[in-house]
Amino acid sequence: YYDIEMQIYNLLLEKSKKETDIYISDEKIELAIHHAEEEQGFNYVVEQLDTIKKSLHRTISLITGKAGTGKTSIMRAIVKAYTENNFTLTASALSAMAAQRITEATEFPAMTIHRTLGCIGLNEFTFNKDNHMITSVAFLDEGSMVNASLFLHWLEAIDDNTRIIISGDHKQLPPIGFGNVFSDLI
C-alpha cells in the first residue's frame, strides 16, 4: 500500500508543478458565473465565488464541504466556464448514482470512474499511464469514496496538460478498500 500512496504523492507533486495551456480570462469567468447563477436562480456566496475562481486558475484543486454546502453548485459554474470557452472536460464519480447527480446538476454528462477510464478487465483500463485521456479538465466527484488503487489508476490516465478538480466530503464514510486519499490530501 505504501508504494501506491507514494506513487499518488509523486504524481500529484509532479502535476502540481506543471503549468497547463488552459486559461480563461477573469471577464469570461465572471460571465460563466453569471450564467450559472441565472440558471440556478440564486447567487453564490463569497466563499463559493472564491472557490470557483481558484479552481479555474489552479492546476490541481480540492473542493470539500459537508452535504448541502454547494459543492455541486460550484461545479456547475466551473463546468460552465470551461465549456463556454471550448475546453474539454471529463466528469467522473465512483458510483453511477453520483455520476447521474452530477449530470443533472451541471447539465454535463458524467460517468463512473471505470467507464471514464474504459474498464476492460480487473484493474485494466483503456486509459492509463501509457494512454492518457485527452481532456482539458478531469473532475472527480465524491473523491472521499475512492480508494487509493482506483485513484492511482485515474490519476495515471490524466495527461500533464490537464487540470484536476476533486470534490468530496472528507467526513463521509471512508472508501471501501485501502487508502483514504481525499482525507489525506485535505
What is the predicted function of each stretch?
Residues 1-186:
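Conserved ATP-binding/catalytic motifs of P-loop helicase motor domains
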